[in-house]
């Protein structure tokens, strides 16, 4: 993990930057509790972990392995659109949700009448239409339910001191209709000194595959919301409940731990976008991303 003395310390946090993630992985490997899980693979698990990532002059896209940046962007824009159709991502050559929208997975989980690609009322639906009755991924839900994302944006603009700027993906009524319950369940925004910060609570964190993606995804959401509200970016605080390593990811993560992190890249939004619904892939410029090679880890199903 390199020389820790070269990293700036933050009050309450021993390490900063990517070393926080690497330390979490190392702690789970050393002290994690062996647990069974729904996939049958098994995990090493610790409960309650937190890291703080500085978003002011850098973007927390891990460098000790290559993270699929375009997928991070396209998935977030898909959430923002309120979409729950995995075929929309597949059409952009993003296949991270394909297996969950497959007829085999849907049938195995009791969704026999679902069209292929229909994931149920997952993240995007909850962000934009919380409380609306979910029919299918093709229905028009315009002005149905609560648009939590737009409500947060409006509140940041009109009442930035508010402590109620929250987006929740955890809707107990809708969970039986989802292909998977949300792993990252809630985020809260905070404005101070002209900066926007975000804290995300993740009930379940797959350290090998999901967590690097989730860190980048919520960092990007913070950049986007800051852009449309005229603020600078502050911090991303990433809090996890069950932080775990699948047993079949251990070898790859040991390779990752042996690598020294490189400087995080910088992110620029290169077009003046005022409506959060108008962002597209070409609006984001990532500079200085020079990661170590990718590491293959199988998705646990």
From Swiss-Prot:
DUMP binds at residues 38, 163-164, 203-206, 214, 244-246. It catalyses: dUMP + (6R)-5,10-methylene-5,6,7,8-tetrahydrofolate = 7,8-dihydrofolate + dTMP. InterPro entries: Thymidate_synth/dCMP_Mease, Thymidate_synth/dCMP_Mease_dom, Thymidate_synth/dCMP_Mease_sf, Thymidylate_synthase, Thymidylate_synthase_AS. The keyword NADP does not apply. One of its GO terms (biological process) is dTTP biosynthetic process. The active site is at 183 (nucleophile). Coiled coil: none annotated. (6R)-5,10-methylene-5,6,7,8-tetrahydrofolate binds at residues 206, 300. Pathway: Pyrimidine metabolism; dTTP biosynthesis. Its EC number is 2.1.1.45. Keywords: Methyltransferase, Nucleotide biosynthesis, Transferase. GO terms for molecular function: thymidylate synthase activity. Belongs to the thymidylate synthase family. Homodimer. Catalyzes the reductive methylation of deoxyuridylate to thymidylate. PANTHER family: THYMIDYLATE SYNTHASE, THYMIDYLATE SYNTHASE 1. This is Thymidylate synthase.
């Amino acid at each position: 993990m390199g020389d820790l003395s070269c990293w700036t310390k933050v009050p309450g946090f021993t390490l900063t930057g990517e070393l926080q993630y690497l330390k979490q992985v190392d702690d789970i490997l050393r002290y994690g509790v062996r647990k069974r899980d729904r996939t049958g693979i098994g995990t090493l698990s610790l409960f309650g972990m937190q890291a703080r990532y500085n978003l002011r002059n850098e973007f927390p896209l891990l460098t000790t392995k290559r993270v699929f940046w375009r997928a991070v962007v396209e998935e977030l824009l898909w959430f923002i659109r309120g979409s729950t159709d995995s075929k929309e991502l597949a059409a952009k050559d993003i296949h991270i949700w394909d297996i969950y929208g497959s007829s085999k997975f849907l049938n195995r989980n009791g969704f026999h009448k679902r069209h292929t690609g229909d994931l149920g009322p997952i993240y995007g639906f909850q962000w934009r239409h919380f409380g609306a009755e979910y029919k299918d991924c093709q229905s028009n839900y315009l002005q149905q339910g609560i648009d939590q994302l737009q409500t947060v944006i409006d509140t940041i603009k009109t009442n930035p001191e508010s402590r109620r700027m929250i987006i929740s993906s955890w809707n107990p009524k809708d969970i039986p209709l989802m292909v998977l319950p949300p792993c990252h369940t809630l985020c809260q925004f905070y404005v101070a000194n002209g900066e926007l910060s975000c804290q995300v609570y993740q009930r379940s964190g797959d350290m090998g595959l999901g967590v690097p993606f989730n860190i980048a995804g919520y960092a990007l959401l913070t950049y986007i919301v800051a852009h449309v509200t005229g603020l600078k970016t502050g911090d991303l605080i990433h809090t996890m409940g069950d932080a775990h390593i699948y047993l079949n990811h251990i070898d790859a993560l040991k390779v990752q731990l042996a690598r020294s992190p490189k400087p995080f890249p910088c992110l620029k939004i290169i077009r003046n976008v005022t409506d959060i619904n108008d962002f597209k892939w070409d609006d984001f410029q990532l500079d200085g991303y020079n990661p170590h090679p990718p590491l293959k880890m199988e998705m646990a199903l």
